[in-house]
């Protein structure tokens, strides 16, 4: 054998040696300490010496045989080296990563996640995470459109879409994106008013910044995709911060007053509309009632006119009596004897006559029959006049 079998002294004073001439009893030195793994070059050298020595001594020490044994030893060493080189070429790409492979320094391909192999010392690779969301922050003092200075901060979230372009299209893609973000933000802020930046225009500024940033990175073709842009803060310089806070508070009060006024309008407008409709309907009803009453009075006087023409005195007296009755019905009445020099005589006519409601009912019934009484009086007068004329005619005829 090329080395001693266990238990075979073979002139080694009872020591068991491994192929490299080390003591094989428990893998320890005589002192009892662990020897540790040997150096790879030292292993190859010792193995070559052992194999060369064994094969060189074979056949009585012939030079040709010794030369063949050395070649075999070097072949074994080469096979071991190749095996080590092959195993060293295996590598693993993570699930969220992609590997960019360079062959002799030149881009060759992109490998997918999993176990891959490359020829060691010929191909090199670099793994890039293409699923992680990365973030960078841009901030600083910026000049607005109305020549004011404002401090703005914005966060940009992005991810890698093309690993090769991310690594080799520009020198440093992250730094290039930071500069592009700062440039886009300054361009948008420079085209906006300070009041809009601090209050209502934040959403518009965020959208405009994202659109401008996409245009810039598309022109650079860096292999990055913008996921989101967040407008973190915008504040005026400390020297004028109090004045801007007052302006913002006044604007908020204005908006609050407007909302309260709108709420009051929404509350009172339906009520006012309903009241207006009610008053309009009442006015229409009053108009119809007054018109009908006037038309009734006109019709009544039109019917009364022939009677008045037939008996003016009687009709006039009757109208006067009805009018006075209507007037005195709604007034308090006191009777006083003005010629008496004694005590004042007070007669409560209203209480004596009864309730005022009964008087009103009586007045209304009398008023409604006024025309009938006048017509009867007129007919009676006409009859008396006719009888008088007949008697006068008979008297004159008797005389003749």
From Swiss-Prot:
Transmembrane segments: 70-90
Compositional bias segments (type: Polar residues): 384-400
Sequence segments annotated as region (Disordered): 1-43, 355-400
Main location: membrane
Alphabetical list of Pfam families matching this protein: Band_7, HflK_N
Biased composition (Basic and acidic residues): 374-383
Cellular component per GO, a single term: membrane
Role, per record: HflC and HflK could encode or regulate a protease.
Record's subunit section: HflC and HflK may interact to form a multimeric complex.
Family the entry assigns: Belongs to the band 7/mec-2 family. HflK subfamily.
Name under which the protein is recorded: Protein HflK
Biological classification of the source: Bacteria, Pseudomonadati, Pseudomonadota, Gammaproteobacteria, Vibrionales
